[in-house]
C-alpha cells in the first residue's frame, strides 16, 4: 500500500495588505539535536530553541501556520506531481501546528524540503525522530513524512544506500536514482518526461517547484487554494504564558 505523506510545507504569512497570503521558506541553516530537543541556526546568525522559534512566529500577527499538500508517496515523480490541477487543489491545506511537537515536525519537513542541509544534520534529525514520542495519528503522519523525506535526501543527494535508509525512500525516487546512474533514456523519457541527460541529473525535493500533469506550478496551485479560503483559514494557536517567555514543554 502506498504511504500518505505531507509535503509542500512552508510558512504561511499574510502580506503587507493583510488581504492575501504568501508562502515562505524557513530562514534556517542548520539544526542542533540534543536528545528529543531541537535548536535552530537561523540565517541571522542566531541559535534558538524550537520553542523560541515558535514563540517568535506566533507573536507576529502575520503568521497563519504551515501549508501542506497531502500526497501518496508515488505521486511525486521528482520531475512532476502526478495529479491534475483540480485534484492537486483538493489535496492542499494549512496545518495549525497547535503544539510544540507538531510545529517542530512541520519545521523539520519544511527545512528538509527547501534548505540545503548537511549529511550530518540529516542524520542528527533522524536521531531526533527516534527520540521523540508521537502518540496521536496526525503527529505520526508528520513524523512518518519527516522520516521519509530525510531518508530520501540522504539517498538522492548523498547516495546513501544502507537498508535502514532505502526502506523509507519512495519507489519513484529509487527508480529516478537508478535512471540517473544507468542513463536509461527510455525510462527517463516516458516515465519521468525527461528530454535530456542534463535534466536527468538535476533535481530538488522542493515540491512547490514541481508542475502538475497539466503543466501548472504546484506552488501557484497551493497559493490559489490558500488565498481562496482566506481569511477563513484556521487561526494559529494561542501561546501559553510560559511559551511566550521561550520555555519549552
From Swiss-Prot:
Pfam families: Herpes_UL7 (PF01677). Plays a critical role in cytoplasmic virus egress. Participates in the final step of tegumentation and envelope acquisition within the host cytoplasm. InterPro entries: Herpes_UL7. This is Cytoplasmic envelopment protein 1. Belongs to the herpesviridae cytoplasmic envelopment protein 1 family. Keywords: Host cytoplasm, Host Golgi apparatus, Virion, Virion tegument. The keyword Nucleus does not apply. GO terms for cellular component: host cell Golgi apparatus; viral tegument. The gene is UL103. The keyword Magnesium does not apply. HAMAP family: HSV_CEP1. It is found in: Virion; Virion tegument; Host cytoplasm; Host Golgi apparatus. It comes from Human cytomegalovirus (strain Merlin). It comes from the Viruses. Its main location: virion.
Amino acid at each position: 500500500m502506498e504511504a500518505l505523506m505531507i509535503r509542500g510545507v512552508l510558512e504561511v504569512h499574510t502580506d503587507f495588505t493583510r488581504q492575501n497570503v504568501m508562502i515562505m521558506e524557513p530562514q534556517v541553516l542548520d539544526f542542533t539535536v540534543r536528545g528529543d530537543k531541537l535548536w535552530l541556526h537561523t540565517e541571522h546568525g542566531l541559535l534558538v530553541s524550537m520553542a523560541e522559534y515558535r514563540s517568535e512566529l506566533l507573536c507576529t500577527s502575520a503568521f497563519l501556520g504551515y501549508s501542506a499538500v497531502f500526497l501518496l508517496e508515488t505521486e511525486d515523480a521528482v520531475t512532476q506531481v502526478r495529479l491534475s490541477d483540480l485534484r492537486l487543489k483538493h489535496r492542499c491545506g494549512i496545518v495549525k501546528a497547535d503544539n510544540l511537537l507538531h510545529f517542530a515536525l512541520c519545521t523539520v519537513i519544511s527545512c528538509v524540503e527547501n534548505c540545503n542541509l548537511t549529511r550530518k544534520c540529516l542524520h542528527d534529525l533522524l536521531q531526533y525522530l527516534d527520540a521523540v514520542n508521537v502518540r496521536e495519528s496526525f503527529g505520526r503522519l508528520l513524523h512518518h513524512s519527516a522520516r521519509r523525506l530525510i531518508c530520501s535526501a540522504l539517498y538522492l543527494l548523498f547516495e546513501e544506500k544502507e537498508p535502514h535508509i532505502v526502506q523509507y525512500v519512495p519507489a519513484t525516487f529509487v527508480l529516478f536514482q537508478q535512471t540517473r546512474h544507468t542513463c536509461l533514456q527510455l525510462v527517463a523519457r516516458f516515465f519521468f518526461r525527461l528530454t535530456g541527460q542534463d535534466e536527468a541529473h538535476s533535481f530538488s525535493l522542493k515540491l512547490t517547484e514541481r508542475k502538475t500533469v497539466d503543466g501548472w506550478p504546484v506552488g501557484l496551485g497551493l497559493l490559489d487554494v490558500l488565498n481562496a479560503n482566506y481569511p477563513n483559514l484556521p487561526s494559529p494557536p494561542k501561546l501559553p504564558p510560559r511559551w511566550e517567555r521561550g520555555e519549552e514543554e
